[in-house]
Amino acid sequence: MRYTDFFSIAKQPAVCYSGYREGQYPGGPIPSVAQIKEDLILVAQNWHYIRLYSIDDHTRMVLDVIESEGLDLKVMLGAYLEAEQNNPNCPWGGGVHEPEVLIQNKAKNLKQVEALIEVAHQYPHIVFSLAVGNEAVVEWTDHLVPVPQLVSYVRLVKKHCTQPVTSCDNYVPW
């Protein structure tokens, strides 16, 4: 298979983007529109594609800035998945969670996947591909998702979106 068999876009430089600055983080304070605009104007000078890891307010602001500023950037949009299964192999000890946390995470993950579908429909001219999960099945992760569940999420997204869908994981588990 060739690259062009999957994507109807040109090969161009790409980079993962997270606009968080000192004191900002996912789930906490996020960059302002002005900060995101400043970043993306710089990013667009050297890259044509960016990857975003999750659907949250920061992501929506990034997409809004790309659209409102007419920036020549396309986005691989991701849905970040939280742990649905304990992973005692996590080397930093973060892979073991209380049962109720795992149940809550599964509900959060479904909302994240549904939001991915919604935002992909909202920005089809910017979002060129979709990624479900980020290192969610590797043996060392602290946010392990069972492979059948990951596949289920991917199939749900594929059913409702026209963009290509993938999962971002290390090749070793496969």
Regions found by a protein language model. Give the residues of each.
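A conditional alpha-helix N-cap/helix-loop micro-motif detector
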Residues: 29-33, 55, 109, 147
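Boundary/entry segment of secreted carbohydrate-active catalytic domains
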Residues: 2-38, 42
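Conserved, mostly hydrophobic/aromatic
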Residues: 15, 50, 130
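Short, well-ordered alpha-helical microsegments
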Residues: 58-62, 173-174
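Catalytic domains of carbohydrate-active enzymes, especially glycoside hydrolases
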Residues: 35-58
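Substrate-binding cleft of extracellular glycoside hydrolase catalytic domains
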Residues: 62-163
